[in-house]
Amino acid sequence: MPLPQNRSKRNMLHKGTPMRKTGKVIAIVQARLGSTRLPMKSLLCLRDVPVIDWVTRRLAQAAKLDGIMVAVPDTPLDRVLMEHLQRRGVPCVAGSEDDVLARFCLAARTADAGRVVRVCADNPLIWAGAIDRLVDFYDQGGWDYAYNHIPRNNLWPDGLGAEILSRDLLEELDAKAAQTSQREHCLNYIWDNAASFKIGTFDPEEDWLRRPELKLDMDRSDDFCRLALKPIHPDMDARDIVRVFG
């Protein structure tokens, strides 16, 4: 089946050594309990299931992933989250709270990732199908970085997808990113220097999935309340999710 047409406006090739697209594909989930906008959000429950379990459970259905690693801050508060993940047998690692890029790289090294899929822990409705399509799109194109987690130059709902880049590029970002914003928001260096990278995205194939106005993530308390009031469950497929939020 042909891949959806790229809609990226960023098409300049990365200047430097081509990034290898080999090795294990690892989803790294950035999770924490210290959010100021929605404290403890990773352990808040939707339908009696903690949000972090929604994310890891739904990611486990992705055929293109070789593993999952959760990256949490090394704070006393987040030790509760680490213990929760360890009890469930979910691989996890603790790193710097403020230097998220360093923590992300630590997780990639710990998991021996070759390609890294970045996932936000506030996306409880993340869809395995979106992850698989993203990996295929990235592998079959000449992209340095690709994404479908937000409706930027594409028609995806907000919160179903992710971002992907090579471990080589991630290590390069770690070496070059000097601004505080680039360390805290770990892939900002790419967007700050977009002319130096080939950035790709694509549309969903299905008309019913082309819903960029839908917000499915859980960033604030009102997002949590909206999700909590919907008849959703952790194994729900994308068509039913779109129908419920329609």
Can you name each region flagged by the protein language model?
Residues 15, 20, 215-246:
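Hydrophobic helical membrane-anchoring modules
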Residues 19-38:
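N-terminal nucleotide-binding beta1-loop-alpha1 segment
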Residues 51-68, 87-88:
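A short, N-terminal amphipathic alpha-helix
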Residues 74-139:
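Short phosphate-binding loop-to-helix
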Residues 88, 126-213, 244-246:
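Conserved core of the sugar-phosphate nucleotidyltransferase
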